[in-house]
Curated annotation (Swiss-Prot):
GO CC annotation, single: excinuclease repair complex
Keyword DNA repair attributed: yes
GO biological process: nucleotide-excision repair; SOS response
Known role: The UvrABC repair system catalyzes the recognition and processing of DNA lesions. UvrC both incises the 5' and 3' sides of the lesion. The N-terminal half is responsible for the 3' incision and the C-terminal half is responsible for the 5' incision.
Protein name: UvrABC system protein C
Major site of localization recorded for this protein: cytoplasm
UniProt xrefs under Pfam families: GIY-YIG, HHH_5, UVR, UvrC_RNaseH, UvrC_RNaseH_dom
Gene3D superfamilies (alphabetical): 5' to 3' exonuclease, C-terminal subdomain, GIY-YIG endonuclease, UVR domain, UvrC, RNAse H endonuclease domain
SUPFAM superfamilies: C-terminal UvrC-binding domain of UvrB, GIY-YIG endonuclease, RuvA domain 2-like
Domain GIY-YIG: 14-91
Length: 590
């Protein structure tokens, strides 16, 4: 298990929710739900597992989670996340089934059905329900309590349901619209929360049956009450309408802000977006700025409705977005806003934890590096690297790390002036001389440690400049690479010798980061320098193309390749006269 996973496991909340396991490519490979995210997710990385689970665990490189308010809510969310991501390790919910809804049809003699598809057909839908068995039991209960028609087509004679008292038999007996309407209203009231009254009635009947020793009947009432309790759990993640809406929640602390967006489509939560950024103004103002930028992105289409916390200026938001903006004060929408805000607060807390851990770890790495080298903790480290191709366009780069973190404003680039050909030692001598001559002249801070990307020869050349030319006594170290161009050894001392380091230690990782960063910076600078050289040399012999037009062409096209792909008309767009553009085109296509 990598360090990142260990750290994320340490801050998991003991709350219900869903978790998404990801592989090294960031692909979601498994979605699960949990009563306690902390206990469930940790269980994957402790103890032994069967073959299938072990294969899953071996592929996990990262994970994320969404906190919910109940287990039922987590189950519904899990279903939607699985449908969205289609993870390869999820098998049970990979088909196109949905959890069931209870439906009252819009027919003249309405029926009560269990369906997995919601249509705009005038029917009344309730759900989806997180427990299939409970939904079926509730439907059976409603059938017994409210004797609506059962048959899909009216038969010529009364069926068994009529004789069981579960159907009024409109096939043979007149049933008025008022009777049907009254039953539908009672069912709607039941499913919308009036079930508590029914539970009380059933409880009374259960006690009466028990007193008269009708234990089977009492057991049936008890099971019906349990089924109601299982089914009627409220799911804040679901809204029983077809409106597409985005729900926003936010939290802020310590100069940072997190905004979480729940995307509800067709009444279902299908995705969420998490953004964490520095807070530069009042949170409510920052939220409005965020809204404008959020929907400016092409892949964020505006829904029919945006749901916002009540402390945001709703009128400004409506004017900004041009869609319906809702700021609920109660009900499911308010609970969704609160849930989004709760997840935002958790994400911020997690970020601060990692920041503190990273800072603590980085400082310790700096201190341990100093111990290994026998010097005080090198709070300021300056590192050099050269870059050239067979001596052409030689450059060098300097990066600065303060307390183990890159200080990019202090990075410097150097074009080599006095060295001809591929001479790495002399290049390093020139650049170090130029750097610290200026440092001394301008009274800039000296580093606590200088790191050279190179071996013993590089160290000897640099030490000669520092001590014999500039009179400086600054700790010096070299980083050697192996045949795969990876950090392999730390060299220090006079004469230079290998400093033993654990390759898994934080100080070794710090040196790797420094070496990778200075190499990246040097190579990027060399690439740009070489590109300019090639660009200018290609244009040198073309009449009418001076330095000003070379610069204009470089700024417009960026490379010889793109300029070569351009037509004469496109060349003219760089403020080049047509006659000159034709000459450039001919030269590039000789």
């Amino acid at each position: 298990m990598n360090e990142r996973l260990k750290e994320k496991l340490a801050v998991l909340p003991e709350q219900p929710g869903c978790y998404l396991m990801k592989d090294k490519h960031g692909t979601v490979i498994y979605v699960g739900k949990a009563k306690s995210l902390k206990a469930r997710v940790r269980s994957y990385f402790t103890g032994t597992h069967d073959g299938k689970t072990q294969r899953l665990v071996e592929e996990i490189a990262d994970f994320e989670y969404i906190v919910t308010s109940s287990n039922a809510e987590a189950l519904i969310l899990e279903m939607n996340l699985i449908k969205k991501h289609d993870p390869k390790y999820n098998v049970m919910l990979k088909d196109d089934k949905s959890y069931p809804f209870i439906k009252i049809t819009a027919e003249k003699h309405p029926r009560l059905l269990i369906t997995r598809k919601v249509k705009k057909d005038g029917g009344k839908y309730f759900g989806p329900y997180p427990n299939v068995q409970a939904a079926n039991e509730t439907k059976k209960l409603l059938d017994r309590l409210y004797p609506l028609r059962k048959c899909s087509t009216l038969p010529s004679r009364a069926c068994l349901y009529y004789h069981m008292g579960q159907c009024l038999a409109p096939c043979v007996h007149p049933v008025s619209d008022e009777q049907n309407k009254a039953m539908v209203e009672q069912i709607v009231r039941f499913l919308n929360g009036g079930y508590e009254d029914v539970k009380r009635e059933l409880a009374e009947k259960m006690h009466e049956a028990a007193e008269t020793l009708e234990f089977e009947r009492a057991k049936e009432y008890r099971d019906q009450i349990a089924a109601i309790e299982m089914t009627m759990e409220k799911q804040k993640m679901m809204l029983n309408d077809f409106i597409d809406r985005d729900v926003f929640g936010y939290a802020y602390d310590k100069g940072w802000m997190c905004v979480q967006v729940f995307f509800l489509r067709q009444g279902k939560l299908i995705e969420r977006d998490v953004s964490i950024f520095p807070l530069y103004q009042d949170p409510d103002e920052e939220m409005l700025t965020f809204l404008g930028q959020f929907y400016a992105k092409a892949h964020h289409l505006k829904p029919k409705e945006v749901v916002l916390p009540s402390d945001i200026d709703g009128e400004l938001a409506r004017e900004l977005l041009g869609v319906a903006v809702v700021q609920p004060k109660k009900g499911k929408k308010k609970e969704l806003v609160e849930l989004a805000s709760k997840n935002a607060a958790i994400a911020l807390k997690e970020k601060f934890y990692f920041i503190e851990r990273d800072e603590e770890r980085t400082i310790k790495a700096v201190e341990r590096l100093g111990e290994r080298l026998g010097i005080p903790a090198p709070r300021r480290i300056e590192a050099f690297d050269n870059s050239n191709i067979y001596g052409a366009d030689p450059v060098s780069a300097l990066v600065v790390f303060l307390d183990g973190k890159p200080a990019k404003k202090e990075y410097r680039k150097y074009k080599v002036k006095t060295v001809a050909g591929p001479n790495d030692y002399e290049t390093m001598r020139e650049v170090v001389r130029r750097r610290y001559t200026r440092v001394l002249k301008e009274g800039l801070p000296l580093p606590d440690l200088i790191i050279i990307d190179g071996g013993k020869g590089h160290l000897s050349a640099v030490r000669d400049v520092l001590e014999n030319e500039l009179g400086l006594d600054v700790p010096l170290a070299g980083l050697a690479k192996d045949e795969k161009h990876r950090t392999s050894e730390l060299l220090a001392g006079d004469p230079p010798d290998v400093v033993p380091l654990d390759r898994q230690s934080q100080e070794f990782y710090l040196l790797q980061r420094i070496q990778d960063e200075v190499h990246r910076f040097a190579v990027m600078f060399h690439r740009k320098t070489r590109q300019k050289t090639m660009f200018h040399s290609v244009l040198d012999d073309i009449p009418g193309v001076g330095e000003k037009r070379k610069k204009a062409l470089l700024n417009y096209f960026g490379s010889v390749k793109k300029m070569k792909e351009a037509t004469v008309e496109e060349l003219q767009r760089a403020n080049i006269p047509r006659a000159v553009a034709e000459k450039i085109y001919e030269k590039l296509h000789e």
